Amino acid sequence: MDRDSLRQYRYFLKDSIRKKVDFSQTDQNRGIDVPPIEKPYRNDALRIDLVKPGDWKNIAKIDLATAIGNRQSRRVYRKTPLNLEEVSFLLWATQGVRGKIVGGHTYRTVPSAGCRHALETYLAVLNVEGIASGIYRYLPLSNQLLYEFPEEQLASKMVDAVFGQPYPGNAALTFIWTAIPYRMEWRYGLSAHRVIAIDAGHVCQNLYLACEAIGAGTCAIGAYDQEAMDRLIRVDGEEEFAVYLASVGRV
């Protein structure tokens, strides 16, 4: 192994960079406007209203210790589809907004460094009742699902983009989290990137626990073809790019 490269990548896991950042020179402290907390979309884009918290009828109240104890990666799924209420619950559990939007930030169901929430949530939908197959994006501010575009042979393209791992092709849907790094860089400069990765872990763990309440399973996916995945969801790979995935299906 290349020891110099190992040291370089291990350095990323440390917080030593924070002592080298001149925070007086970050864009926030230079008075540059805060970046949007949600990626923009066209006004005429198709949006699906999700079921609001408090209106769920069939989401089980499961003991937290039970959910934690049963949590595991599940790669084999039944053909039974998920429904809109269940998808609404999973999206709320992983990126839902709690309370009011204050001062350009949102309090959500997951923690984020400095409340910056640099992640966007895409869904590759294959088997959800009443929702056409295709690529969607969660809009946490309005609690809606934005229809991005249809995609032919989506199941096989998802499998190809994760180096042949089969379970995204058999799942009801796959969560694809992207990072928009500038949301975090605006405040933290060069110390932003490690905490974006940490934030992704918070989100995915909530998905694991939430799946236990709806009779579903999930499997986190950290191995994927970066360029192929970015092309599939049509992000530029520079200002926004995929950082984490998780397939979800009925078990």
PLM feature spans:
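Small-aliphatic-rich amphipathic alpha-helix that forms the alpha element of a beta-alpha
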Residues: 90, 121, 171, 175-184, ...
